[in-house]
Amino acid sequence: MKKQVSLLTLTAALLLGACSTYEEVPATSGDGATAVGFLADIAPREQSRADINVDFGTGLTGTWNGEDKLGVLANDFSKLLQFTYTTDSKAFTGSLFGSAGTWAYRAFYPHNGNATVSGTTVTVPFSALRTQNGNKYNSEFDIMAADAITHNNAKPGKTPEGNAVKFNLHRITSILALKLQGGAASEKIASVMLTSKKPIASEKLTFTVPSDPNATYDPSAITPKLVVEGTSAMGSPISINSEHITVTYADGTAPSADYSETFFNVLPDDSYGDLTFSACTDKGNAASFTITRTTPVVANWVYTVERTAPFTKAAAPTVEWIGHEDLTTPTELLESGNSADIRVSAPGGIKSMQVDITSSVLTTPMEGSEQNLLEAVKLAPSMELTNPANNDMAAALAGFGFPTPAQLLNQQHVYFQIGGLIDMLAMVCAEVTETTNSDFKFTVTDNAGQKTVITLKYVKTVVSPITYNNDADLWANTASFTLNIPADATSVSVQYRIKGQTTWN
């Protein structure tokens, strides 16, 4: 195959559907449930995923496997069911409740337990962080929707003729397939990142599942969309989409840097423009190149890129506190809505990330307790984010918006928001009687051992309501003071007393 230098090429993957045979599954006893086995084939030019391969010449090949799970809605479209592929029966098996009559079905793939349905809208994960097993394709984000089906006078899971219901699935995404060479055989690929100028991933993706059994499949009616905003554990809005997709590897499966195959499921787009592929090794060496795609990327198609690129020592990590160019002057704490958005770029892959907190209000034991506030919420003054001290700390860190170890290790780009923790700091500082400083120092180390440090500085300034101007005149028997009057004050009075006396004047 001709090597592609500047353009993604379209591989017409002319694939045969996975023609499954069906064996009757005995019904479970009790509960009124009927054991059902659904069949599922893929529309032409797609393949029945799971065990799937791209040979960069003929396209996709593969079969369903025992890890594949189908999301099914049957009559009660508010109840999402999960059917798991069984290799013995070559069908997706599960249970339906009901008797013979009219049965209407909707289905999608995959349903790994995190999907939800509201009406005809399905929400599934479409994460920026993905894992491959070596050079094998990962089917977790290969989203498909089935044509709607309705059968009258039929038993659950059957056609009127008594055959198993078969879903015809349509792939919603496009597949970008990268074959990369040029690194040292002695090094392992730590991660491969795809970067676009527009969002290409999100914690949540929504699409419309077909609902009219008489309608021809219309890709434009599926309307897949990336969800832009979510809510943090502290209740504040956070961004959940990303312009990056990063692939890392299951333990012990990372391919050698001299040859790797990486796959990215993305949504169709009329013109992605610049697409950058960046790879790094476990030794901190990196390779990167950009291609330009100005023609449409279409659902159901595989687009392949083959490249030999030099791997050289990566640039040191950079850490950015977004919106804060001056890191020497502390930022005044607000009552709420404090911003703490952090962007980390590590071309060599992150090996470790530590945060050190210096704050008297967070680290001093609370009144009537031996614990300080950090300890009370399962945190500590010094924490290794890539290896939290215990499960409680790991859960607490995630709750406050810190990235998890999986979101850090070998990643080349990390974005996180910890404004909720800073809002908690502001709540505590509302009670202080003197100016208080709090520092959050982040230390990022990449796979090459290069370190970058950044400190987020916050201050709660407490202004005295009355300040002596240090201008006493003993001869004139006078002195002056400056009052700091709140803007919402309705009346102001000043009292004084002579030293040694108890009466205020």
Feature names for model-found ranges:
Residues 497-505:
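Recognizes extended acidic, P/S/T-rich segments that occur
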